[in-house]
Amino acid sequence: MKLESVGILIGLRPMGERDSVARIFSRDFGVMCGVLRGAQTARVNRPLVGQIGAMSWNARLESQLGTFHWESARNMAAPIMMSGARLALLNSAIDLVTVLLPEREAYAHLYDETLNLLDALGTDNSGVAYLNWEIALLRDLGYALDLSHCSGCGARTNLNYLSPRTGRAVCDNCAAPYIGRLYKLPLTLDVTARFLDVVCADQGVTLPVSRRRLTV
């Protein structure tokens, strides 16, 4: 059995002295794991977390771990490594993908959003880009946030609150009786973290430490 796609290398774990078990977020097949031969000893084009490239995965049976062939096209993480704050955002995104996405289920839209995030993490727009990426992650996992209109009356102005139950915006008038129960807009990482906690609880996992360390 052979699968081919493009992907982002999001994890490497040593396997013996030469090989590694790689985790790749592919556009067509989602998160996949497999053995990457010679990953630890390669002197040219050494596999590194944060690379994007072409991958093929081979196994006799679909249930097997299988092996990867990986051709890196670009190391997206290189410009990020010099900034501790941007590196923290990268680590959080990788860990969230690893923990929350089921293996071998395609999330093509989120894959594209992740590529956009990797590009943006090397710029001054990294914080906003990361917040937008978390919103995309929540949406693709079935927890879409709707900030377009008030969930109570349909108003499109004065949307300064968010319902923790529905993830929908609430205008000032409708929010008045429930101020203490609502999240304040605009969105911050503190608010998206609360929704991510719900997702993690539903999946029986905990929010990654790298995500908990991010500041608001």
PLM regions: where:
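Non-catalytic alpha-helical scaffolds and adjoining flexible linkers that form interface surfaces
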Residues: 1-21, 25-216
